[in-house]
Amino acid sequence: MKQILFMDTTLRDGEQSPGVNLNEQEKLQIARQLEKLGIDVMEAGFAAASEGDFQSVKRIAESIQNASVMSLARAKESDIRKAYEAVKRAVSPRLHVFLATSDIHMKYKLCMSKEDVLDSIHRSVILGKSLFPTVQFSAEDATRTAQPFLAEAVEVAIRAGADVINIPDTVGYTHPEEYYSLFQYLQESVPSYEKAIFSCHCHDDLGMAVANSLAAIEGGALQVEGTINGIGERAGNAALEEVAVALHIRKDHYKTQSSIILKEIKATSTLVSRLTGMMIPKNKAIVGANAFAHESGIHQDGVLKEVTTYEIIAPELIGESQNLFVLGKHSGRHAFTERMKELGYELTQKERDAAFEAFKALADRKKEITDEDLRALMLGEAALLTQQYNIKQLQVHFVSNHIQCATVVLQDGKGNKYEDAATGAGSIEAIYHAIQRILEMECKLVDYRIQSITQGQDALAHVHVELKEGPHQVSGFGVAQDVLEASARAYVHAAGKLKALLTLVK
């Protein structure tokens, strides 16, 4: 069986989704979960993009032990050296250098001739190999590149030392048959083809990213790139969880294997969704809430008689918990700690103490605490650790004519408290106005979403907000049993990130 490598770009391409702005701690959280998932290569970011990106890539590179850590770089010496400084301490550092090869990009974006492009590819890969043990070259907009020139560019990159060649469908233009044929063409037309691993990278503009990725694998690609939940700019990228499960379920056809730990898919998908604020459609393949639901009477009858009549994927395969194990207010520290370990959380004593206190507070208000509650609780605690301000007091009361008044007390990391009050057309608007007054900000709320994490009247609420000031847009989330408290936490989380961002760019 062919071994397929999985390269995840959730932290780079995925973060380019509008409104997604992960901080360093959140990126590290996702990176560690990707490591548990069995990802072979993770693109931690674009080190040369900003100091914040550089620090995030550097920290991930120093923390990950069981996957290659890669930084994106343009075909520029400064970018390549910056990428090296960021990932040089990784167990397995890798460079991803790219340059466009299509006529439209060379003419209008690069303003370069074909000869200039080939020379730039040669020089950048040579430099990369002098610094990195592994170099990946991407021919940006490969699917709209004239095939003879693409083959020439790929040959130049391999001869210069490129170990991996990526053939990206940058604008989601191709279709499965065409993409398969392109990989076959390169196999026949590139003299040094056998000296490199070929990779596919598909965007979903025409809804074919996963299908194209699978076609590329059939065509000879040994590495597949994408993101968790298919997030990314425009219509997103190939959803890696869909590719992984498709290869597993239809291994009779694809005859491949990979290092992906399928039972970690659900946990990874949920974490990425909640940290980015990009909710998963209920009907999404593999990880959607309805992926294993049956409403039709005929389907229900069939499943009850024999599950394989209408289910080709067992929920347990992807870690969809069927566990009815619950905790409650009488559960002790030992039971809580053991359950957190079973869910994959390795906590320090300080983190364990804080999480247990939060658990006991929740257990006083909620009869039964499920695994989903615990995951949400940990997500909320992680958010609190990265916030500049925490909510100490929140009070709302009715004034008149649908006007509400909110009083908010925030506390910063040094213990200083700040209090203010404001009115609004509803409780949430009043709370947000009060927080704005305290933080002296005039940001605009561009998105507000609320989701029930578990079922029942005592369910936890997960609120996601997006704030914008000028060209800068960030997201934040809050988790609490009370909707107003969750909403306030989400706003403070986002506002703190935006305030820090504005301070950096001034």
From Swiss-Prot:
Q: Keywords of this protein's UniProt record, alphabetized?
A: Amino-acid biosynthesis, Branched-chain amino acid biosynthesis, Cytoplasm, Leucine biosynthesis, Manganese, Metal-binding, Transferase
GO BP, sorted A to Z: L-leucine biosynthetic process
Q: Which cofactor does it need?
A: Mn(2+)
**Cross-referenced InterPro entries, in alphabetical order?**
2-IPM_HCS-like, 2-isopropylmalate_synth_dimer, AIPM/Hcit_synth_CS, Aldolase_TIM, LeuA/HCS_post-cat, LeuA_allosteric_dom_sf, LeuA_bact_synth, PYR_CT
The pathway entry for this protein reads as: Amino-acid biosynthesis; L-leucine biosynthesis; L-leucine from 3-methyl-2-oxobutanoate: step 1/4
**Which cellular components does GO assign to this protein?**
cytoplasm
Location(s) in or outside the cell: Cytoplasm
Which stretches of sequence are listed as region Regulatory domain?
A: 390-506
The residues that the entry says bind Mn(2+) are D13, H201, H203, N237
Catalyses which reaction(s): 3-methyl-2-oxobutanoate + acetyl-CoA + H2O = (2S)-2-isopropylmalate + CoA + H(+)
For this protein, the record's Pfam families field holds: HCS_D2 (PF22617), HMGL-like (PF00682), LeuA_dimer (PF08502)
- Per the UniProt entry, the Enzyme Commission number(s) are 2.3.3.13
Q: Which domain of life is it from?
A: Bacteria
Give one GO term, molecular function aspect: 2-isopropylmalate synthase activity
Which family does the record assign?
Belongs to the alpha-IPM synthase/homocitrate synthase family. LeuA type 1 subfamily.
Its function, per the record, reads:
Catalyzes the condensation of the acetyl group of acetyl-CoA with 3-methyl-2-oxobutanoate (2-ketoisovalerate) to form 3-carboxy-3-hydroxy-4-methylpentanoate (2-isopropylmalate).
The record's subunit annotation is: Homodimer.
This chain belongs to the protein called 2-isopropylmalate synthase
Q: What is the scientific name of the source organism? A: Bacillus cytotoxicus (strain DSM 22905 / CIP 110041 / 391-98 / NVH 391-98)
What is the taxonomic lineage of the source species? Bacteria, Bacillati, Bacillota, Bacilli, Bacillales
The gene coding this protein: leuA
